[in-house]
Amino acid sequence: MAFPDITEDDLNELMREEAEDVFDDDGVSSRFPDIMAAGTHSPGGPNGIIRSQSFAGFSTLQERRSRCNSFMGNSAVQKKPISKPRKPHLSGHKSSSSSSSSREPQPKRVEEVYSALKQGLDEYLEVHQTELDKLTSLMKDMKRNSRLGVLYDLDKQIKTIERYMRRLEFHISKVDELYEGFCIQRRLRDGASKMKQAFTASPSTKGTRESLAEVNRRYKEYTENMSTFEGELENLLGEFHIKMKGLAGFARLCPGDQYEIFMRYGRQRWKLKGKIEGNSKQSWDGEEMIFMPLISDLINIKVTELKGLATHVLVGSVICETKDLFTAMPQVVAVDVNDLGTIKLNLEVAWFPFDVEDLTLSSGNVSKATALQRRVSVYSQGTPETPTFQDTSFFKWQPRRWEGQRLSFLHTLRETLIEKLRRSRSFGDLAALRPRSRSSLEVYSTLPDDVFENGGCGVAECKRLSFTFSDTSTSSPVPVQSNPEITVTPPETDPSSEPPPTSEEQLVEEECVEEDCGSISVSVSVSDPDLEWDQVETQGPETGSVALSLCSESQLSAVGPEDVVFLEPNVSDEALELKPVELDGEEGSLTRQLVRRLTSSDMLPETSALSWAGENSRTFMESSLEEVIQSLLLRLESLGQRCGELQDLEQEVMRLEDLLKCRVHAHRSRSSSLSLTVESALESFDFLNTSDFDDDDTGDDAGTLSRAVFFDMESERMGSGQHPEARGHLSEALTEDTGVGNSVAGSPLPLTTGNENLDVAVVIHLQYCNHLIQLLTSGGSQLQHKTYLHKLATQTLLLEELSERNFDRPSSCTSVPDVLPGLVERPALMSLWSDCSGGLFHTTLDRVLKHMHLSFALGLQQVLPHSPDSVIKMVVNEMMDRSELASSSTSPAQDVITVFQFHRYIVEHCITDMEQHLLDLAKEVMLEEALSCGDPERSLKELKKVSITCLQPRSQTLLAVAGLLTTDDPEVMKATTDFLSSAASHQPFRSKAVDCYTQALSESELHTQRAACAALSCLQAVESIDAVILLCDSVDEELRQIAIETLLTFGEDGRLAYEQLDTVPREMVRLGTRRGNAVTTSF
């Protein structure tokens, strides 16, 4: 068939008519929020999926009109044009392979995701091959009776599909290559693990220890390689485009109900709120979100009903599997939110193998550049603001050279703030600060929310940032302004290495003295591993301001004099009551910390009482207290059958959450002065305000135009689909992104115990509980499950004691003696912990190791000359409940140990003197080496002189003793038998020995199983009879004989078990014989 010629005027007319069908004459207000309406009549037919007949889309104008009309007729409110879906928080996600190498690889999960990904890619390839065949046959039919223009367009589409298919094939080859490399590293790691077990079981010699160290190094290397391959494979998973279709529930959703849906996928988050309208319509403030697929994480969905000012009712929370979403066709997913399934969340999920932004044509770059030049020309025509105190000579703008580096959010924020402050010189105008143009605002509107929620800066490696709000000192009798000083504090540096102040800085100080006022200096820098922090103090006689600089190898980019702002000396006395507040960028949301610290400053310890651990304690907490509690509750809810220990833990965690929420509500009822201080502090960040702006705020110097150009380029790069005014006022954005604020639908303030050091300790123990539950659900023997449940019960008791003793009284959790009275009864151990931590609730592992080395290494060297520090590391690892292999893969400066772990260890081992305990442990290590050396005379000598009460005992020692029961020397076997038989009367030793030997029965090495069987026989461990019965059917004749002999030594219970074991096979043999005869006779 022939297609009519369509001119450019006809196309413009058609586009105008289509736009009039979709939008009214007045258009859509640029300030209207992004609303998506979901009704019962879905567009595109019963499936709700619209797909064109070809890759580029051969849909007619009537079809497009009908689809638009059917969709818009279902909307309850006006809509703006559908914008590009925004991506959630991507800080730290898929940034580099170094971030992925720190996590533990998950081979089974990688295998599952790889199979699903490969199937999805093959399905994509088949779909496009079918599309290509269809277009190719269509082109052959149209060659004779069609115009050249139509054939040209069709040929372009065919070539586009062919290029896409070649890209898919290359993508598949990369996926296969990465997975093959992952499998190779997995097999190498499994081999290293088996070698480690072999060297561990062999006699300890110098060569064995060196080989074991090499195997451990290889094991760590293979593990890191697996994590690297896993991270690279994760980067090739594409994108999930999730569209909100609304909630569904018969007689459950009523008009006027408001709901909040929170989706969490690893570090990516999507929060949207909606309202149930009349006529089965719903309005939501979000339509579509892009999630980057992850390998190890699942999608957590939580639906909350908003009933009042601060009353939120949890409707339900579910965890969704993601490997089934790798399909070529979009899927409509109905998620049962509650247990009964009366409320369902309808989502449309589409998977794209590549980033959609990568598929744009090259012509798009020309249009972007044209739009960029047009916006720059428009914004440069405005009238600049009237400058304030512009006649001051040292207030001049000097454009900085960025040396080809792309600016981050923090650099952009810093430059905009400094330029505004330069012209205003009034801290009172800080609340009105905002970026300079509409194009500048698009940078903030399209930024990942993780910038506000997790404090990320969008780069792979970030140095620690710390914002300090302190009082500004002045000698004037007039009170200083209530706005606190904002300073970025770097890690401590040597004061002697600080450069002297420049002449311009001295002018700043002199001017500050003349005006008799405080100052503020702000310096925020991009994080770069090649850059180092340096500190320049510019402190006048009557001011206490500190200017910071970023020092590189060749130049010093210091805070210029234009960065200094003078405060007006007309404020209230309430500022004098504020205490310095330390905030850390690595902890998470800076605004969340700000509100928590300002609202609970009366309960914090004095600054003078805090050591370095107190100042930096928040850097150790990767997640907030609320996030860890919710994560643990979600994991507990995901378990089907829960035993008593898990139920008790869940009840205690929920009780803890309720107590902390009560504390937050109590904080809300504080005096109005502090509330106004918090509100004022939040308003100080309104320079991020994107709800309104000044079109004529264009600046008056050369630096302004360059920054406007950068904002436009950055906006185009990050995507201009989202409207720059969609975020609204910063207070609204903070309420939505961080859960703080005082809006009607806002979430409560962050949960806290009132002491940030105690917060960190509680978070570590909650994360430990989460880890134990993960181990519990990952398989293992029955004895291992019993051990995990016992540890969970211990953590439950700890949380219960903390809740009853501390959280119900505001002033009861400020020091260790208040929280752990039992530790005060041991003065020497209390002093040891205070020296390691400064009296706080946690400290770093590196500090503990160094202090214990200085205190006890000299005495240990006399007992264990070759490795005295190994005993100290052994004790600390047991405090933290981790293996030596895991401890060697992390840095001691990053690991944290809590006072509760320290106290649990000394209670379990009944320690009153740590030095004596270490000496006994060193002697036990020497005993283990003597028993494993293979010298019968030395082994006999050590067995005769060792005291059972002095042994801890360690698993390695117990296995070394059991190994002597399988030697060929009868004298050694008799001495070992007598030793274990006498040790059976010592209950602590017997309990640990039975657990150790029972666990050893499930190992793969025959030598270890034989020795453990013989040791259980000596201990008369009847409680291990089930594990011994399993070995009676072993293929190995010697092991089977030892298991039977051990079973017969267990008295009456063992004899009955052996008789049952002996009769069952005979009955089965007789039954099989009768059946065989019957079959033979019939034929």
Swiss-Prot record:
Residues 81-92 have a biased composition (Basic residues). It comes from the Eukaryota. Expressed in the eye, nervous system, and skeletal muscles. Expressed in the otic vesicle. It is found in: Cytoplasm; Cytoplasm, Cytoskeleton; Cell projection, Filopodium; Apical cell membrane. Gene3D superfamilies: Leucine-rich Repeat Variant. GO terms for cellular component: apical plasma membrane; cytoplasm; cytoskeleton; filopodium; stereocilium membrane. Disruption phenotype: FAM65B morpholino knockdown leads to significant reduction of numbers of saccular hair cells and neuromasts and to hearing loss. FAM65B knockdown also results in abnormal muscle, with low birefringence, tears at the myosepta, and increased embryo lethality. SUPFAM superfamilies: ARM repeat. GO terms for molecular function: 14-3-3 protein binding. GO terms for biological process: cell adhesion; cellular response to chemokine; chemotaxis; negative regulation of cell adhesion; negative regulation of establishment of T cell polarity; negative regulation of protein localization to cell leading edge; negative regulation of Rho guanyl-nucleotide exchange factor activity; negative regulation of Rho protein signal transduction. InterPro entries: ARM-like, ARM-type_fold, FAM65_N, RIPOR3. Its main location: cytoplasm. Keywords: Cell adhesion, Cell membrane, Cell projection, Chemotaxis, Coiled coil, Cytoplasm, Cytoskeleton, Differentiation, Hearing, Membrane, Myogenesis, Signal transduction inhibitor. Residues 206-240 form a coiled coil. PANTHER family: PROTEIN KINASE PKN/PRK1, EFFECTOR, RHO FAMILY-INTERACTING CELL POLARIZATION REGULATOR 2. Acts as an inhibitor of the small GTPase RHOA and plays several roles in the regulation of myoblast and hair cell differentiation, lymphocyte T proliferation and neutrophil polarization. Plays a role in fetal mononuclear myoblast differentiation by promoting filopodia and myotube formation. Maintains naive T lymphocytes in a quiescent state and prevents chemokine-induced T lymphocyte responses, such as cell adhesion, polarization and migration. Involved also in the regulation of neutrophil polarization, chemotaxis and adhesion. Homooligomer; homooligomerization is regulated by RHOC and leads to the formation of concatemers through the association of N- and C-termini. This is Rho family-interacting cell polarization regulator 2. It comes from Danio rerio. The gene is ripor2.
